[in-house]
């Protein structure tokens, strides 16, 4: 029975030490790796600001993103 108790004690002492993250493994300590997951508007295409389309419902509208009134041609 004492062998089982000793084995259980050793297992309980060793497992939490290996299961916890060490300070060096924290994402805050690795800025280069954090940049891979950056979802700022400069990187993520779904967050980009887009101009409204020039041609809506068959009419050509003037928006700051449109260069001329002929923006609907070819569409």
From Swiss-Prot:
Propeptide: 20-50
Highest taxon listed in the record's lineage: Eukaryota
Compartments where found: Secreted
Source organism of the structure: Conus purpurascens (Purple cone)
Principal location: secreted
Alphabetical keyword list: Acetylcholine receptor inhibiting toxin, Amidation, Cleavage on pair of basic residues, Disulfide bond, Hydroxylation, Ion channel impairing toxin, Neurotoxin, Postsynaptic neurotoxin, Secreted, Signal, Toxin
Bridged cysteine pairs (disulfide): 54-66, 55-71, 60-72
UniProt modified residues of type 4-hydroxyproline: 52-53, 64
Domain note: The cysteine framework is III (CC-C-C-CC).
Tissue: Expressed by the venom duct.
InterPro entries hit by this protein: Conotoxin
One Pfam family it belongs to: Conotoxin
GO terms of molecular function: acetylcholine receptor inhibitor activity; ion channel inhibitor activity; toxin activity
Protein name as annotated: Psi-conotoxin PIIIE
Modified residues (Glycine amide): 74
Signal peptide stretch: 1-19
UniProt record similarity statement: Belongs to the conotoxin M superfamily.
Function field: Psi-conotoxins act on postsynaptic membranes, and act as non-competitive antagonist of nicotinic acetylcholine receptors (nAChR). Is more toxic than Psi-conotoxin PIIIF. In vivo, has paralytic activity when injected intraperitoneally into goldfish.
GO CC annotation: extracellular region; host cell postsynaptic membrane
């Amino acid at each position: 029975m004492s062998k089982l108790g000793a084995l259980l004690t050793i297992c309980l002492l060793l497992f939490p030490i290996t299961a916890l993250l060490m300070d060096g493994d924290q994402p805050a300590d690795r800025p280069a790796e954090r940049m891979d997951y950056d979802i700022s508007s400069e990187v993520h295409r779904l967050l980009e600001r887009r101009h409204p389309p020039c041609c809506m419902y068959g009419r050509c509208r003037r928006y700051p993103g449109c260069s001329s009134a002929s923006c609907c041609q070819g569409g």
